[in-house]
């Protein structure tokens, strides 16, 4: 199940080496504007060579750390997953000073042990989208993204960011999984049962609609990226008579029930990420991009 509302927070702090540490965190919210968790909030309209991002950047502070909030599907949720301008979103965050991205995503479970209400720190993905541009290096802007980029996608997510999130989940005593493979589908429809079962055969644990190409694009920009999966349902693969299959109403209800703990995880994680020395990680990420160009 894909998220209904998705927000990205971007956290930046200046270090001695004069580069910013930013984390983008995506967030589902129904009837709640995440600007409420920001202090000194202000709105900034930006543009990129790929057009405008999904919404204005909302700048402020969380726990004393500079943050930026961006709604992936726009604040009114009028942009379906296929039409999100992923390239503009990630580039807008990069150009705002982002170097580290933490995302959250509502997702369905393909595995009995991954129960609704639990969280998962994603560690791999399977891309089953069909309509989305997967790269910045497609020749459309050779002045900025020349050549061809053959980006290695193992690991698919930043291990450093994952470790911080896992440690914070443990500290908060949350029910979570420290690994999960997620399959991203095109949407906006949910899977058929045959599709759901086929994804199980691929050894996917979870299913959503937006991790791809977002994780790939962040990596092409040299931005370490991690994602928190918020498990809301069991998709439609269960065959017991009392099985409840995915629908919008049940997903929203489960998300609302877990909003407080996800917010707590984000707010408590931000100072830990801010305290981490990202210099070598950023250098390694940027070197990987350079070495992936042909």
Q: Model regions: which residues?
A:
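Metabolite-binding pocket within alpha/beta catalytic cores that recognizes anionic/polar moieties
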Residues: 1-3, 18-153
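General beta-strand structural signal in soluble alpha/beta enzymes
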Residues: 69-71, 101-105, 121, 176-179, ...
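Generic hydrophobic/aromatic pocket-lining and core-packing "Φ" positions
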Residues: 90, 196, 212-215
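Non-catalytic positions within long, well-ordered alpha-helices that form the structural scaffold/packing
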Residues: 94-97, 200, 219
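Active-site rim beta-loop-alpha module in soluble metabolic enzymes
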Residues: 156-200
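Zn-dependent metallopeptidase/amidohydrolase metal-coordination segment
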Residues: 209-248
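His/Asp/Glu-rich mid-to-C-terminal helical/loop segments that flank catalytic regions of hydrolases
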Residues: 236-289
């Amino acid at each position: 199940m894909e998220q209904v509302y998705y927000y990205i927070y971007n956290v930046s702090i200046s270090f001695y080496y004069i580069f910013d540490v930013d984390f983008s965190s995506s967030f589902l919210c129904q009837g709640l504007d995440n600007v409420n968790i920001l202090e000194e909030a202000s709105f900034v309209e930006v543009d990129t060579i790929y057009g405008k991002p999904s919404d204005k950047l909302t700048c402020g502070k969380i726990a004393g750390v500079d943050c930026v909030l961006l709604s992936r599907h726009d604040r009114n949720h009028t942009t379906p997953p296929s039409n999100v301008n992923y390239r503009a979103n990630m580039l807008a965050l990069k150009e705002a000073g982002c170097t580290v991205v933490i995302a959250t995503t509502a997702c369905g479970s393909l595995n009995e042990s991954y129960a609704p209400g639990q969280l998962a720190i994603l560690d791999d993905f399977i891309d089953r989208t069909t309509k989305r541009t997967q790269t910045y290096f497609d020749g459309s802007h050779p002045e900025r993204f020349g050549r061809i980029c053959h980006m290695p996608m193992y690991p698919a997510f930043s291990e450093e960011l994952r470790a911080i999130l896992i440690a914070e989940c443990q500290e908060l005593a949350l029910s979570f999984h420290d690994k999960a493979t997620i399959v991203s589908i095109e949407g906006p429809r949910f899977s058929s049962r045959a599709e759901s079962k086929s994804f199980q055969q691929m050894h996917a644990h979870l299913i959503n609609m937006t991790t791809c190409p977002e994780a790939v694009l962040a990596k092409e920009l040299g931005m370490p990226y991690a994602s928190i999966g918020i498990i809301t349902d069991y998709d439609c693969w269960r065959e017991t008579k009392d099985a409840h299959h995915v629908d919008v109403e049940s997903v929203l209800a489960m998300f609302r029930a877990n909003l407080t703990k996800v917010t707590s995880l984000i707010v408590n994680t931000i100072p830990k990420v801010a305290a981490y020395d990202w210099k070598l990680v950023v250098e390694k990420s940027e070197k990987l991009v350079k070495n992936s160009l042909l």
